[in-house]
Structure formats: C-alpha cells, structure tokens
Amino acid sequence: MGGIKVEKIKIKNLIFSYPNSEKTALNDINLTVNQGEFVTICGKSGCGKSTLLRHLKPILTPHGKTSGEIYFNGKSIYDLSDREQAENIGFVMQNPDNQIVTDKVWHELVFGLESLGINSAEIRSKAAEMASFFGIQNWFYENVANLSGGQKQILNLASVMVMNPTLLLLDEPSSQLDPIAAHDFFTMLERINTELGVTIILSEHNLSEVFPLSDKVVVMEDGKITAENTPYKIGEELKQNSMFAALPTPTKIYYSLGNNSGNCPITIRDGHKWLEKQQINEHFEFKSEKNRINTEPILELKDVWFRYEKNSDDILKGLSFKVHENEFYAIVGGNGVGKSTALSVISKINKPYRGKVFINDDTKVAVMPQNPQSLFLKKSVLEELYDAVFDVEKEKRKNEIEYVIKLCELDNLLENHPYDLSGGEQQRVALAKMLLRKPDLLVLDEPTKGLDACFKRKLATILKSLQKNGMTVLMVTHDIEFCAEYADICAMFFDGKIVSEAPPRKFFAENNFYTTSAKRMADGIIENAVLDKDIIRALGGEAEDLTETNDELNYILPKKTVIKQGKKEYKKLNVHNVVLGIVFVILFVMTQCLFCGRYDNWKNYVAQTISILFIAVAMFNLIPRKKLGKELIQNEKSKRKISKRTKIATLLILFLIPLTIFIGIYYLGDKKYYFISLLIILETMIPLGFAFENRKPKARELVIISALCAIGVAGRTAFFMLPQFKPVAAIVMISGVAFGGETGFLVGAITAFVSNFFFGQGPWTPWQMFSFGIIGFLAGIMFQKGILRKTKTDMCVFGFLATFVIYGGIMNPASVIMWQSNININMVLSSYVMGMPFDFIHAVSTVFFLFFATEPMLEKLERIKIKYGLIE
C-alpha cells in the first residue's frame, strides 16, 4: 500500500496581469506539486513560466492584479513571514551574476545565515557542510569575480541550500552555462532531490538534461497550462505542438517514427538501447557537407594576445582564425575560456597588445552582445527599433521596421519596456535591432540563450536567409545542437585560442563528450550520425530540412503590419548645434578659469552666473531632446486630497523640526549638532511609518529612497569645485514630486546630513537639512494639489523661487543666529543682502539641473512606481 502524498504546493485558479496590461500573464492556473517531486515547467518564451515561479515566493511576486489561491504545506503562501519564506523556499535566478551580492565565495555562502541572525558556530558548521556537499572547498576563499559561469551558479545554489529549504525554485538555471557545466549543475539538483528530499520546481528550455530527473512535466502556452504528464507520456501529447522540437533527442526520434507512448526512451542510455533493436537502413548515406567557401576573408585574426590588466593573466593567447565572406562560422567552448573576450577584440571594444585584427574598411559590423539589455536605451520595443534606423529615410524606415516586427514575432511586445520582457523576448528584440542595421558581418554572442526551440528554428531560418543574401555570420554559443545543424564551420575555443575547426559533421563526429545528443545516442550504431534527423532518416523516417530557406524570408522584404505610431522622436543634432555647443563649452571654461574663487565685487557674481548660462546653452545644443507626447503632467483631481500622513508630516516639518533646531541652539548651545541632525531624521521618518501602516514594506521601497539620497550626495560632491553650483535642490524636488512630500523632505534632510561628512559637519547641518527638506516637501504637496505640474517650465520656475527664497531665506539668517549672540534686525537684513548673489547662483544652477534632469528622471521614477507598485 502506497503512502499518502503530501501536497507541497497547491495552486487554485491563479490569474495574474501586470500593471497597465490588458493581457493576463497567468490565466486560471491549477497545479498540485507533492512533497519530494521534481517538476519541470516548459513553454515558449513569454508564456508565463518565470511569472508563475515568482508567485511561489511572495517576496518576489511581481506587482499587478492577482486572484486565486496558492497553498504551501496546506497554508496560504501569503501568510508566510519573510523569515519563513527565506528558510523554506529557495529561489535560483536565470543569470548567476544577478543573485550574487558579496565579493568572496565564503561570504556569499554565509550571507543568508547571517541575515537570519544564526550564531557563528552554527554558520561555520553549515558552511563547511555545504562546501563539502557541493564540492566548492577548493575555491572556498576565491573572489566571486574569478569564478566561471558554472561555478557562480553552483555557488548560488549552495547559498540557497545552506538555508535548508524544503522547496527549491529555479528559473532557467542553465541558460548561461556550457553543456558540461549544465550537466554538473543538474547532477547536483538530482542529488538535492533524491538525497535530501527537497521538492524542486524549475523552468527550462533545455529539456534533455531535466527530463530524466522529472516526475512531472508541465507545458505552458499564453499563460495557461496546456499539458501535464510524466516525461514518458508528455511527448505523445505534444506531437502536434510547437514544443515538440524542445523534447530530448531520444523522445523526439521515438515519436517522429510514429511510435506510441509505451517504452519511450528519455535518456541517452535508454535511447541507445532502443536504437540497437531497430532496423537500420544500410543504404542510407548522409548528405555530403559543402567545401569551405573559397572567398576572401571578411575577418582575420593573426596571433592576437590580450589581457584586461597589465599584470593580469592573458585571456587570448595567440588567437588566429579566418572567417570568409558569406560564411556561418560558429565558435563553441566552455565558460571562461575567452570566447566573449575575442568578440570584444573583433568589435574593437578592446585592443590587443600583440597581433592584428583585419576587417575590410568598407565592412559594416553589427555585434549582438551576450547581455541584450546593454543594447536597450529606450522605454518601449518600438522606440528601440526606430532607434536602430534613425538615419534611414522615413518611408523606407517604416517598411523595414514592419518587416522585422513580423520576422522576429514582436507584434505583441511593441509597447512593452524592453526590461520587462523575458530573456528570450529580449534576445528577439536585440536580434531585430541588429537586422535593421543590415551589416555585412553579423557577430552574435550566445544568440540562442533563453530562446525556446520554436524560435531557434526561426532564428536558424533567418540566419540562413541572411547568408543567402550575402551576409557573413560569426557566432559564439554553448548550443551544440544549433551549431551542428546550421553552421558551415565549427571551431573549438580553449585556453585563449582556437584549437580545432572543421565542418559540423566532421567536427562533432570526432568528439566524444563535447558533441550532440544524437551522436552519443547513435555512437557505434550509426556511423557519423550527428543530428536527430540523421537517425530518423537512417531508420526510414522523414525529417524536415530546415536549412532550406523560404523565399518569403528574403531580407528586408516588406510585410504590412499595423504598428502604432507611438514613437517619441528625438531632435537630431546638426553641425550648427555642435559648433554652438563647443563654443559655449569653451566660454564656460574660460570664465571659470578667469573668475573662479573671486567674489570681491558684483561683477564677479555676474560672471559666475553667466558661466552657468554658458554651460546650459552648450548642453542645450549638444544633447538630443525628446519631442514628448502628451502624458500625465498634472495630478488628477480625484487624487488631490491631502492624506492623513501628509497632514501629520506638515505638522512635524513646520513645528516639531523648527522646535528641535530652536532647542538645539538655545539649550544645547549648538554643540550637539550630530544629535540634532539625527533627531531631525527620526522625526522625518515618522510619516513613512504611517505610509507602511497595515502592510509590509518591501526592500525596494527603501532602496529607491536611498538611491535618490545617494544621487544627491554624489551630485553635490561631483560639483564641489563650483561654488553654489549644486544639484541637491533639483534632486530633492524631483523626489518630492515623484514620491510625495514626505519622501521629498526625507531625501533632502538625509542628503544634506550625509554630504556634510565630505564637506564638514557643524551647527549649520540641521539648518541645511531643514532647508533642503522643506523644498522637497513643498514640491510634493504642490504637485499633490495640482498646483505644480511635471513640466520643465513649472519645475524650473518653482526650483528658482524655492532655492532663492526658501533655501536662501532660511540659511542667510541662520548664519547670523549661529554666530551672533546679540541679534538685531540689521544683522538679519545684512545677511540677506550679502547672501543674495550666492543664492542667485544657487537658484540658477538649480534651474540648470532641473532643465536637463526633470523629464528623464521623472520618466524613470514613474515607471518604477508603476512596475513595483511603490507608494507615493
């Protein structure tokens, strides 16, 4: 009699949609995962796999509209405390670098335990246990930066498992790893599941490694679960599904030959045994590979040596190879051997200290980096595409964009922010940008990373079509199967150089470990079989030859697709703008050299003010500006009511904080300014306590406030050499308008306090904290009431008046109060008169920073608020 199955996770009718999105990311999800099971979730890019996984750890759940229930050990998952989540639910992310937070391996390993307050003896014991279990004792004290991608992912896994979770979630953990590192990683997962009994749920595109480990496979499409079964039976359900191409090689071959789900092989070993029993077509011959293209090299590297630091080890060690015109050249190799470094040298990002890189002068090169996010500069996919063809005439530009949207399947992503897309979707957008540049040489670094099997086929067809139209492709990848089927030449990269190269069949047939699944499955049975279709054809089946390109995929053949003209144009720079900009930069430098530090008469003050205008005019001419569409620039009438916490903050700021400063001056003799400053900060944080009432504040809410304070401090420090030329008031105003008056005051107060550690603390610190703080508070209140709008004009006018009247109006008499014992009206008036030139320069500089910073900063902060549901 079998034991009773204990439900670890139970999801009932889960529906989720992201903010400002009509499409549901998760649609009526129902799923049960029992204790100790290994469950694999698969599906096309953007189908909702990552979103579903993040719902299983509430602290990582994305902001949006959610309905339905999720139970963990029979208890609502939303009732788990942060500590219970950290201890019981582990999460390993797709990119190893995104999860590492410390500099040393052992620091990373114990970070979670230290955060939970575990005592030192227990931490040492658990760290030693994990290091031994995961085999990281040999690099226990190593710098994290020196680790390979596989080691980093093992470290992330160990750092999660040291907390002893009972549920482990993994989001495409092998997407950054080479095949051998991925195999080692999944072997470790198998041990965790079988030896420790940990329940594992992971999403993955590479199913060959995870199928044999899985108890259940879940297939998702458009936010829904479309299939759910054991690995041995799921293949039959997917015969007519696009996900069939993602199945492991033995499974795919088995069902392609018309078999039913009786004894379906899912491992290479099972596939090999099954293949031994099959009737092989003795007269079958593989299609002969073409000879290498006999054309001039479009790219040649000769004895290239490169290192990142003068005294560091060489990364490239005598690298030499040629890529001929109209060739598809693929480079494979393990993590950390120098493949991406070689591409950086080819693209001239880095320069070798020895050797030569030859590229024809008229060769147009486009490089798609390993991280596609480094290409994204705009706030929507459509804007990114327009940015790639900004120099193309309008009508032709539209046709090319319409074509590439259809080609790369971006129709439903055009209004999305590139950073909100899944990894595979980001790869498609990056590829589209590269195609729009129409290069002669297309350089791709891990282009299949994060792509589902269906779009990999589409990518292959695109690349072969580009070749047909005369383009040369150089690709670095871990995807052995992709190289074997579509490349013309494959090369092995090891120890800083290429050690072997050959056509794919010859290249992979001679390898025993770094080779395709089909080759390992057919080893000793079908000689020289490298691809799935080789085995299928040898057994008398039919297989589609995807390398034959479609006529309709001829490059830049326009296809009519309806796209919204929501793009925000940028004003292009011309020679006139550039010349004017350079002239005014020179005038600014000359003025500063002649008048810096001179404040002995009014003429010098005027000169300083004029110098600010010079640099403003220069930046106005040199920086492209947006032609913005109509957006929300004024707070809605329904949201203009002042909240309870804002009223409390008003009382604190207008009465309690001035009272604190007064007591500090007259009862503490102005000598306890550190105490007074800290007291002001504590008083400022009281309204935020009301903001977090009845809910759990997330770390990101505090991080964004800290980041704004850091920007203010860094800005004040960066411009220390220019008297009164400071961005602090501008940053504080923007903070208040974006997140409310209380946040504005807090940012102003903390910025003044922290920056004075660099400029000197003293009795003036509380006064500066109050002055900057009240500017941020008033900016927030005025926007809340609809008086102040999010426009350059409104912000600049308010910034000038606030800095000149409020900051100057407080700090000028403060100088008298701080240093004079017998104060009279003449002293106060004199302080105003003497301070006006300084206040004027400060006010003009605030206008300067607001003019250039208002739109980009408010745009980004607004996006952060919407995406993460932050408070105002």
Enumerate the language-model features and the residues they cover.
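Conserved ABC ATPase "signature" region
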Residues: A121-W139, Y386, K396-L413
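Conserved beta-strand-loop-alpha-helix hinge in the C-terminal portion
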Residues: M220, K224-Y254, K497-M521
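ABC ATPase nucleotide-binding domains
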Residues: K239-T295, Y514-K568
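Conserved ABC ATPase signature
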Residues: N143-L147, H417-L421, E425
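H-loop/switch region of ABC-family ATPase nucleotide-binding domains
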Residues: E204-H205, T477-H478
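Catalytic Walker B motif of ABC-type/P-loop ATPase nucleotide-binding domains
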Residues: L168-D171, L442-D445
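Conserved ABC transporter NBD signature motif
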Residues: K65-K75, G355-K364
